[in-house]
C-alpha cells in the first residue's frame, strides 16, 4: 500500500508566482524602455534647439560617396533631403514623372560605374517607379531609391499616401530598409550603397519617413500637444510621445563615418581560371559572347578592350558591351550569331545569359565546350538543366576573369580562317541590308536607308539611347556605337519608355558627348513631356523619332496571324511641333525632303551644340526588314 504524498502548504506557490509575474513585468518594462530608447537617451542627448534636419545627413552620405546628381519629382515628404543636397553642391534634377527619375539614375549608374540616386515622395510617387526599379534589377544597375513615407508614428493609421512600401520593393531590391531614427540615416545609407554595388549589382531602397527628415521643432509641433493634457491617460500619452520624439533625435548630430564601405565582389579562383585556359587553348573555332556584366567596375573598359584584342577570339557584343571594340573591328562579329554558335567548338559566355536572347540555350551546340562566367549563380546556370550544359561555370567578376584568362593564354593564336569565315557571313548580311535600303516603300521614307545615313553621320563622341520596337530593332543591325558604354537600351526587361530618362542621365554624366536617342513613335509617347525637363535644365539631347504611325513590331505578327490590326494603329503625329510647344527645337523629315536627310541631321546636331534639345520627326514607311522578329 502506497503512502500518500504530503500535501504542499497552501501558500508555497504564491511566492513563485509573484516572482514570475515580477520578472515578466520587469522584462516588459525593460523591453519598452529599449524600444523607446530610454537607455540610449541616457548617454546621447537631444539638441532641442538645433534647426538641423535628417536631410542633411542624407546629403552628407551621398556627397561622401561621390554622388553628383540626384533625380527627383518633388514632394513634401522629401523636401529636406533635396534642399540639403542643393546646399552641398549635389545637383537636383527634377523630372515630370517619377519613372523618368529612376531611369536617369539607372543611366548614371551604368555610365559612371557608381550608384545612381533618385528620390521620390511617398505612396503614388513610389508606386510610379516600380517599372523602372524592376528594369534596373534585371539590367543589374546599382541604383539607390530614396522614398518618403508617413511619420513613423502614423504608419498603418490611415495617414496621407501611406502604404506598405517595403512589401512593394522587397521583391525588386537587394536591400530594403525603413529608417526609424535620425541617427540611423548614415549607417543605413552606407550599407545600402555598398549592397547596390556588391555581388550582382542592383537597386536598393531606403524609406525615409517625414519625422526622420524634418527638424526637431517641426516634428515636435506635429507630434506633441502644445498644452499639457489633463488626466492620467493624457499624461501617459504625453510622456510616451515626448520619449518617442527624444528617441527619434537622440544622438542625431554626433559625428559618424560617412564614406564608402568595402565592396564584396566575387572573383574566379586560380584553379577555375587555369581549367578555362586549358579548355580554350585546345580550341580550333573559339567564340566569345560578351554581355553587360563585362563592363562593370573594377575592370576599366580600356583594359577589357585591350585584353579582348590580345586574346584574338572573335566576339559578339551585347548590352553595355556593344561598342567595346569600336566600329568595324575585325574581331567584332555582328550578324548570324546562332549559326556561329552552332559551329564554334569552344564558347565563352562572359556575362551573357541563356534566356530568350540565346533561345534559352538551344542555339548552343551539344558538341561545344562552354565556359560561362557570371557574378550571379542562378543566372549563370539558367536553363542549363534543359537545353545546354557548361563545361566550366565560374561565379565571379566577368571583366577580371577575362583579364586573367588572357594572362594564361599569352602567345596563343588561332587560325585566321575561322574569323574570316564569320566576317564573310557578316559581309553577305550587310549586302542584303544595302539592298533593302534601296527598295522603295509605299509612303514616306525607307527606315533602313534613313538609319544607314544615321550610321554615316554619327560622331565618335556620341552616346546612343534606344527606346522602341521595330525602328530600334532595325537600328540594332545598322547603327554601331562608337565605343564602350555608348549604347543604352533597357536590357532584358524590354521596357518601353526608358528613352528620356536614359538620355537625361547620359548627358549629365558625359556632358561632352552628343546624346542621340532613337525612338519608335510608340515609345516616344512616354518621353515627350520630358522635353520640358530638358529645356528647363538646359540639357541638349537629340531625338530621332521613327514615325510609322503604329505599334509596328506587334502589328507584324498580329495582322497575319490573327487577321486584325486592332490597337496597333497610331497617327502620323507632329511630334516635332509638340516638342516646340515645350520649348525644344523641332525638325521634320519626310518624302518632301528625302534628299536632305544628312543636312537635317547636321542641323539638329548644330542646334544641340548651341544648347537646345531637338526632336527630328522622321516619317517612315514599312519594310519587311524585321519580318519574323520576336514580339513576345
Curated annotation (Swiss-Prot):
Cellular compartment(s): Endoplasmic reticulum membrane
Cofactor binding note of this UniProt entry: Binds 1 Mg(2+) ion per subunit. Binds 1 thiamine pyrophosphate per subunit.
Source organism phylogeny: Eukaryota, Metazoa, Chordata, Craniata, Vertebrata
Membrane spanning residue stretches: 13-33
Top EC category: lyase
UniProt-listed SUPFAM superfamilies: DHS-like NAD/FAD-binding domain, Thiamin diphosphate-binding fold (THDP-binding)
Protein keywords: Endoplasmic reticulum, Fatty acid metabolism, Lipid metabolism, Lyase, Magnesium, Membrane, Metal-binding, Thiamine pyrophosphate, Transmembrane, Transmembrane helix
Species of origin: Homo sapiens
Cofactor(s) it depends on: Mg(2+); thiamine diphosphate
Pfam families, alphabetized: TPP_enzyme_C, TPP_enzyme_M, TPP_enzyme_N
Similarity-based family: Belongs to the TPP enzyme family.
Tissue expression notes: Expressed in all tissues tested, with highest expression in heart, pancreas and placenta.
CC terms in the record's Gene Ontology section: acetolactate synthase complex; endoplasmic reticulum membrane; membrane
Membrane topology qualifier: Single-pass membrane protein
Identification of the protein by name: 2-hydroxyacyl-CoA lyase 2
Binding-site list for Mg(2+): 521, 547
An MF annotation (GO) of this entry: thiamine pyrophosphate binding
Amino acid at each position: 500500500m502506497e503512502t500518500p504524498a504530503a500535501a504542499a502548504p497552501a501558500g508555497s506557490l504564491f511566492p513563485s508566482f509573484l516572482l514570475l509575474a515580477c520578472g515578466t513585468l520587469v522584462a516588459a518594462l525593460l523591453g519598452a524602455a529599449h524600444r523607446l530608447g530610454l537607455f540610449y537617451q541616457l548617454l546621447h542627448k537631444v539638441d532641442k534647439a538645433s534647426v538641423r534636419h535628417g536631410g542633411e545627413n542624407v546629403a552628407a552620405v551621398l556627397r561622401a560617396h561621390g554622388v553628383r546628381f540626384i533625380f527627383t519629382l518633388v514632394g513634401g515628404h522629401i523636401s529636406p533631403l533635396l534642399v540639403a543636397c542643393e546646399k552641398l553642391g549635389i545637383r537636383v534634377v527634377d523630372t515630370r514623372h517619377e519613372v523618368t527619375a529612376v531611369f536617369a539614375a539607372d543611366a548614371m549608374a551604368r555610365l559612371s560605374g557608381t550608384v545612381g540616386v533618385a528620390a521620390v515622395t511617398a505612396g503614388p510617387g513610389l508606386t510610379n517607379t516600380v517599372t523602372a526599379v524592376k528594369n534596373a534589377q534585371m539590367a543589374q544597375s546599382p541604383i539607390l531609391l530614396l522614398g518618403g513615407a508617413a511619420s513613423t508614428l502614423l504608419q498603418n493609421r490611415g495617414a496621407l499616401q501611406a502604404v506598405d512600401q517595403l512589401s512593394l520593393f522587397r521583391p525588386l531590391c537587394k536591400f530594403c530598409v525603413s529608417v526609424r531614427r535620425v541617427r540611423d540615416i548614415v549607417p543605413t545609407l552606407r550599407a545600402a550603397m555598398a549592397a547596390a554595388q556588391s555581388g550582382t549589382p542592383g537597386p536598393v531602397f531606403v524609406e525615409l519617413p517625414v519625422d526622420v527628415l524634418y527638424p526637431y521643432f517641426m516634428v515636435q509641433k506635429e507630434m506633441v500637444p502644445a498644452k499639457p493634457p489633463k488626466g492620467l491617460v493624457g499624461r501617459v500619452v504625453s510622456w510616451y510621445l515626448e520619449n518617442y520624439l527624444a528617441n527619434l533625435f537622440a544622438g542625431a548630430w554626433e559625428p559618424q563615418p560617412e564614406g564608402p564601405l568595402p565592396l564584396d565582389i566575387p572573383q574566379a579562383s586560380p584553379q577555375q581560371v587555369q581549367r578555362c585556359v586549358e579548355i580554350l587553348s585546345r580550341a580550333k573555332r573559339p567564340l566569345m559572347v560578351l554581355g553587360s556584366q563585362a563592363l562593370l567596375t573594377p575592370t576599366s573598359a580600356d583594359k577589357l578592350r585591350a585584353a579582348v584584342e590580345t586574346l584574338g577570339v572573335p566576339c559578339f557584343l551585347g548590352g553595355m558591351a556593344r561598342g567595346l571594340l569600336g566600329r568595324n573591328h575585325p574581331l567584332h562579329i555582328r550578324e548570324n550569331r546562332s549559326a556561329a554558335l552552332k559551329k564554334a567548338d569552344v564558347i565563352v559566355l562572359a556575362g551573357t545569359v541563356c534566356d530568350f536572347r540565346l533561345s534559352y540555350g538551344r542555339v548552343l551546340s551539344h558538341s561545344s565546350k562552354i565556359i560561362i562566367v557570371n557574378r550571379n549563380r542562378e543566372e549563370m546556370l539558367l536553363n542549363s538543366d534543359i537545353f545546354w550544359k557548361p563545361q566550366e561555370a565560374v561565379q565571379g567578376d566577368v571583366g577580371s576573369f577575362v583579364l586573367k584568362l588572357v594572362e594564361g593564354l599569352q602567345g596563343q593564336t588561332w587560325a585566321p580562317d575561322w574569323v574570316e569565315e564569320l566576317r564573310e557571313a557578316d559581309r553577305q548580311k550587310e549586302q542584303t541590308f544595302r539592298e533593302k535600303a534601296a527598295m522603295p516603300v509605299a509612303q514616306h521614307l525607307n527606315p533602313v536607308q534613313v538609319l544607314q545615313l544615321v550610321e554615316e553621320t554619327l560622331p565618335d563622341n556620341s552616346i546612343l539611347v534606344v527606346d522602341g520596337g521595330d525602328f530600334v530593332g532595325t537600328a540594332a543591325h545598322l547603327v554601331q556605337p562608337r565605343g564602350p558604354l555608348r549604347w543604352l537600351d533597357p536590357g532584358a526587361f524590354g521596357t518601353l519608355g526608358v528613352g528620356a530618362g536614359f538620355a537625361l542621365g547620359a548627358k549629365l554624366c558625359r556632358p561632352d558627348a552628343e546624346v542621340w536617342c532613337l525612338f519608335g513613335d510608340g515609345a516616344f509617347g512616354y518621353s515627350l513631356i520630358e522635353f520640358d525637363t530638358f529645356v528647363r535644365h538646359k540639357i541638349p539631347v537629340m531625338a530621332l523619332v521613327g514615325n510609322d504611325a503604329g505599334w509596328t513590331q506587334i502589328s507584324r505578327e498580329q495582322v497575319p496571324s490573327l487577321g486584325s490590326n486592332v490597337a496597333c494603329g497610331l497617327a502620323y503625329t507632329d511630334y516635332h511641333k509638340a516638342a516646340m510647344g515645350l520649348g525644344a527645337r523641332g525638325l521634320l523629315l519626310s518624302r518632301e525632303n528625302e534628299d536632305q536627310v544628312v543636312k537635317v541631321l547636321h542641323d539638329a546636331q548644330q542646334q544641340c551644340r548651341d544648347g537646345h534639345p531637338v526632336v527630328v520627326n522622321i516619317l517612315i514607311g514599312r519594310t519587311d526588314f524585321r519580318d519574323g522578329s520576336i514580339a513576345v
